[in-house]
Amino acid sequence: MSSKEKKSVTILTESQLSSRAFKDEAYEFYKELRKSQALYPLSLGALGKGWLISRYDDAIHLLKNEKLKKNYENVFTAKEKRPALLKNEETLTKHMLNSDPPDHNRLRTLVQKAFTHRMILQLEDKIQHIADSLLDKVQPNKFMNLVDDYAFPLPIIVISEMLGIPLEDRQKFRVWSQAIIDFSDAPERLQENDHLLGEFVEYLESLVRKKRREPAGDLISALIQAESEGTQLSTEELYSMIMLLIVAGHETTVNLITNMTYALMCHHDQLEKLRQQPDLMNSAIEEALRFHSPVELTTIRWTAEPFILHGQEIKRKDVIIISLASANRDEKIFPNADIFDIERKNNRHIAFGHGNHFCLGAQLARLEAKIAISTLLRRCPNIQLKGEKKQMKWKGNFLMRALEELPISF
C-alpha cells in the first residue's frame, strides 16, 4: 500500500492486511498509527468490524484483558449469527489458542510437560545433529535457499519426532499449514483451503487410528492416553491440538531463523560483531524477534463486554487484532526502534505474546534458532546474500512475517 493509498483508506480490509504490498510498507504504516491513530478500523468480512492495535502499552493491556475472548462461543449468544467457518475448519478449531479459561488451562496442561526447560534441553544434541545434517547436504554446493534447505526442515523434523509423525509427511504439513494460516477471503482460495483442510483432517484421523493401535512414547500417544482416561479431551480437541502443535511447532521458528539471518545479512556490522562475540547470540535472537517479529499480527480476539479505549467505544462482538510487529517497534519502549542492535538492553519484546496465551514453545524456538544460526555462522563463515536486498519478497500472509525465499552463498 503506497503512502498515497494510506491517506485515502479509512478502513483496512482483511485482504489488504494479507497482501505483500502491506508487508513491504507495514513498518512505516505502523509508525504513523502509533503517533496518530492508536486504534485503526478494520473490515473483516464475515467476522465483522475490528480494530488494529499498534502501541506496546495497549498490546500488553489487551493481551491480558478478560473482556476479550479467544472462543467466540463465549461472546455470541445461541440466537446470534456465529462467524462462518469453512466446512473442514470446524474439526480443527478446538485448541488452546482458541480457548479461554478454564478450557485453556485444561488443554495447555495436557501438553506443557513436553515443553518444560528440562525437556527442551534434552533436545539440544538432536537439534545440533539435524542442523549439521542439513548443512552437510548443501555445503558442497556453496549455495542454498535458506528457507527450503534449512529454516523449514529443521523445526519440522524436531516437532515431527516429538509428536511421533513420519518424517516423509513433512512436505504435506507445509502445504496444510499455509492453508490454516491463510486468511484470504477470495472464493477460489477459500475453496482450495477447505479442500486442503479436508485432506489434513483425513490424515489426522488415520494417524490417530494408528497411534491407538500402536501407542509409543510420543506426544500424540500421550494425548490419546489422556483422551481415553476420561473426558479431558474430545476427539475434536485431540485433532485440533495435534494440528496446533504441528503448525505452531514449526511456522514461528522457520520465520525466526530466516528473518534473523536476513537481518544479519542486511546489517554487516552486527553480523561481524556476532562473529567476534558469539556470547551475544542470545541477545541477538531477542533482537531478531523484536526487529522482524515472526508473528506479525495476533489471531482474533472477540470483545465480550464493551469498553472504551483512547476515547473510542469497543463494542461487544468487535474483533481486536494486535500488531506484535508494531508494538515491538514502539519508540516509547525501544529507543531507536528501527535500528537492529544485537546488544539492545532491556529488550521487553512481545514476539511470543503475553499473558495466558504466551507461546508454549518459546524456549524450543529460541534453542532451535540458537543452534541453527550458530552452526550456520561457524560452518559457513563467508555467508552472504545472493542477489539484491530489494529482490527479497515478504509473503502475503495475514499472521506471519515470512520471506518467500532467502538465497545465500558461502
Curated annotation (Swiss-Prot):
One of its GO terms (molecular function) is iron ion binding. InterPro entries: Cyt_P450, Cyt_P450_B, Cyt_P450_CS, Cyt_P450_sf. Heme binds at residue 359. Keywords: Heme, Iron, Metal-binding, Monooxygenase, Oxidoreductase. It is an enzyme of class 1 (oxidoreductase). CDD domains: CYP107-like. Its EC number is 1.14.-.-. Its cofactor is heme. Belongs to the cytochrome P450 family. This is Cytochrome P450. The gene is cypA.
